[in-house]
């Protein structure tokens, strides 16, 4: 997507110009993994015009494979992002109707070729709210056929659809997952009930390899305390709590996903996996834009408790 944002902490109503960047949930994960040294590819549909090409170039810049991106249609999805500060929360306005990817069909993609030899496939509920369900299911079936691990981040967005609308779609999609990322309310949506421990119940009902959820204590829009929980092999693991001074919180959950995927691909033990994933998310909160521009060594230093903010010379 194209992200248009007022400069600094200006509000929408004040702004006479907008900063233009590109991002989006799965794209953010792909870039995060590429920055961690993982071969990553991104599949979507974008127009052939210059704005569509600029979106492609924004991924290529970080080494993401774009050769399976379908080209056509007229619009790139847009979202407007107003940063929060102190007691004032941030705001997002979506303008995605009629985007190339929202109108795309199964015939636009060759998921079998795109997923050949893939170890992992990641998708989110944001995409499920925009892209036709049969396209998503085709991608998931190709991923399972390729033997890839499938992760799904529930990622409910109230400005895209209602929870009831989302439940109908996600209950078709989530059974394909090996790894589920979400929160207690998301788990209750899928379960149709409110157990004492929704994520544990979901983990057991679906037989996932792992489930993960992040926690966020909001001191203000500028200061949060971030942590996470991971359930795998029947056991649960909690990360440390990390205080974060926020530069840009958009993409923080996607950076968590990238860190989780990286750690699991590399066979990290569960405790270090959740620490690394949260460290990745914390680093993203300090970076402007959607993408997590961080190296493995930086996330590892934070996860190991060795990051002190001093200048590295």
Please state what every model-predicted region is.
Residues 58-60, 66, 84-236, 243, ...:
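Ribokinase/PfkB-type carbohydrate-kinase core domain
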Residues 1-65, 85-87, 104-106, 238-240, ...:
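Glycine-rich phosphate/adenosyl-contacting loop at the front of the ribokinase-like
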Residues 1-2, 48, 156, 186, ...:
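Short, glycine/acidic-enriched loop or turn micro-motifs at the edges of active sites
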